[in-house]
């Protein structure tokens, strides 16, 4: 199962007590602030969850798989996510719990 933005808003509605509009706006605002920070070149640290960081990848040679022709892959900036140790431990603990069930 994948948790969507709409489902996240529904959870805020159910668990926190926001009305549906407030919950949707809260989720949208959170994502927008993360996007803005990354667009401005800043990393985003969510304590106990993980870090979103930007990484510059240099230009490198590539190859067209159909023709074998060498083509340059342009330099680009990518977003990476590194889970915190706390999140990793919780996921691992949950996985072990499922294995034993």
Curated annotation (Swiss-Prot):
Region annotation Disordered: where it falls in the sequence = 49-70
Q: Which SUPFAM superfamilies match?
A: IHF-like DNA-binding proteins
| This protein's UniProt keywords | DNA recombination, DNA-binding, Transcription, Transcription regulation, Translation regulation
Tell me where the transmembrane regions lie: none
Q: Molecular function terms in GO for this entry?
A: DNA binding; structural constituent of chromatin
Please give the GO cellular component terms listed in this UniProt entry: cytosol
Q: Which GO terms describe its biological process?
A: DNA recombination; positive regulation of metabolic process; regulation of DNA-templated transcription; regulation of translation
Q: Which CDD domains match?
A: IHF_A (cd13835)
Q: Which InterPro entries match?
A: Hist_DNA-bd, Histone-like_DNA-bd_CS, IHF-like_DNA-bd_dom_sf, IHF_alpha
Keyword set includes Lyase: no
Task: Give the function comment from the record.
Answer: This protein is one of the two subunits of integration host factor, a specific DNA-binding protein that functions in genetic recombination as well as in transcriptional and translational control.
Among PANTHER family, the record links this protein to: DNA-BINDING PROTEIN HU (PTHR33175), INTEGRATION HOST FACTOR SUBUNIT ALPHA (PTHR33175:SF2)
Q: How does it assemble?
A: Heterodimer of an alpha and a beta chain.
**Similarity-based family:** Belongs to the bacterial histone-like protein family.
Under the heading NCBIfam families, the entry gives: himA, PRK00285.1
| Name of the molecule in the record | Integration host factor subunit alpha
Organism from which the protein derives: Nitrosospira multiformis (strain ATCC 25196 / NCIMB 11849 / C 71)
